[in-house]
């Protein structure tokens, strides 16, 4: 699998990276402000988990390290945020694992359709050797894996009507993450998959660019997509989780003790979800 970038995406990413750099305040003394991003709203569980990391980090270091969270896609789409982290323009980002599939193939296993049976099954995998190897795999391409968050099962929702059988998916234009796994799955089911970033889904539903999408129930509610797409079908076709990653360059600029502290807090933040 390979990453493909369009000129417009590259230019957008550069612009956002410059904007993120401008957001960094001048640091006085030994203090350092880390930046974290998320496309979800302020009270979404992953945003609260990362905010908790910041609170603990500041307390543990007596204010020497602090963390500011930019939520609601303030610094762009997930793909933009991944690129910004890789190049050190931001420090930490929480992204859906499907957005990482094409660049970090180890993440693919967690999103394979109907492979993971339940939340308990997922936790057994990501809390063990599988999760460790996935987090270790980010270092090869400019990131450090910090934690894996359970985001719940993913199901299909749409504007046209209830899905009672797999045949009801035929011809539906469904938004999917930019992942080959999800494109192939929906094509196999007869749907017409349309890759869009999370922030584009509401307007795409509103303008009928798409008929529906697939996601977890928390994202469905927090983004208020239920106001347009009123038919939720409990397909539970994937338990693909969210992953917290950090810029490798910026991580390595921390002391060994601070690196260990940040890793430990990230792991503890899983329970905050």
Model-identified regions with their sequence ranges:
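N-terminal secretory/targeting leader peptides
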Residues: 2-5, 9-121, 129-130, 136-273
